[in-house]
């Protein structure tokens, strides 16, 4: 049981790091080319959706394994 929660904490940490890296790249790209901010925004939303989807699958598996 404790190992399941530890794995969930690691998955949550991975999601946080991935979202931080995504936002870092977005801000760097927006600083270089402000004209493409609308395109970057749609890609950012899609990227965050995939990252959060991976976390939710991990969360469901942790409850199923429990």
Swiss-Prot record:
The lineage of its organism: Bacteria, Bacillati, Bacillota, Bacilli, Lactobacillales. It comes from Streptococcus oralis. This is ATP synthase subunit c. GO terms for cellular component: plasma membrane; proton-transporting ATP synthase complex; proton-transporting two-sector ATPase complex, proton-transporting domain. M222 is an optochin-resistant (OptR) strain produced by interspecies recombination between S.pneumoniae and S.oralis. It is found in: Cell membrane. It is a multi-pass membrane protein. CDD domains: ATP-synt_Fo_c. Belongs to the ATPase C chain family.
